[in-house]
A protein has these predicted regions:
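Non-heme Fe(II) oxygenase catalytic core, chiefly the N-lobe of the double-stranded beta-helix
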Residues: 1-119, 132, 137-140, 151-161
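Non-heme Fe(II)/2-oxoglutarate
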Residues: 93, 122-124, 128-195
């Protein structure tokens, strides 16, 4: 993961080697899907992609681990190859993008590729790659675990924080990955407690 997130002796590793931004399980049943999202055209710092002087500098790298086989009809992850390098929005992006209250999927987009995995397989990709999922048409559930890593200067996008108990059980190296910031200041945090 260090190979993709940032370079040694750069600002990307100012607080630690990298940052595990989030991890979660995703369970999806028949008829469910995730519309296309991300893409380099959005220009977000959080999920940027850059390759310079022989080194990767990725704002967020995802690892999807299949807990069950994912084949045709199982709602596999869909990617748009090379979209992490394009500054131009895919012409079918809006039609297939994530929308609240509406199930959209990405498997019929031009140039899209649905990825099939065996239980235990992992899929690694930079978050600026346009991705989503196909609609699950088979019975049963698609089950995956997602881990997202980024440079040490990143911070949680959701209000979840590692517990003091978890942090006390980690090595110093592990702590730098799970919580690279020793103290986080906030204008609403008068006592300057870690938030």
């Amino acid at each position: 993961m260090l190979h993709f997130v940032g370079g040694k002796n750069t600002f990307d590793q100012h607080h630690g080697p990298l940052f595990i931004d989030e991890n979660f399980a995703n369970i999806r049943g028949p008829g469910e899907a995730i519309g296309i999202h991300s893409g380099h055209h959005e220009g977000l710092q959080r999920n940027h992609f850059r390759f310079q002087e022989g080194k990767f500098h990725c704002g967020q790298v995802n690892i999807l681990l299949a807990l069950k086989d994912i084949g045709p009809g199982d709602g596999g992850t869909v990617i748009i190859p090379s979209s992490h390098k394009s500054n131009i929005r895919h012409p079918e992006f809006e039609k297939n993008s994530m929308k609240k209250g509406k199930v959209t999927s990405a498997e019929n987009m031009t140039a899209s590729k649905e990825i099939y995995l065996k239980a235990g397989d992992g899929l690694l990709f930079v978050d600026s790659l346009c991705h989503g999922s196909a609609k699950r048409t088979n019975k049963g559930e698609r089950r995956i675990v997602v881990y997202r890593y980024g440079p040490s200067w990143g911070f949680f996008r959701h209000p979840y924080r590692p517990s003091k108990k978890l942090l006390s059980n980690l090595t110093e190296f592990q702590k730098k990955i799970v919580m690279p910031h020793e103290q986080v200041l906030s204008p609403n945090n008068k006592e300057n407690k870690i938030i």
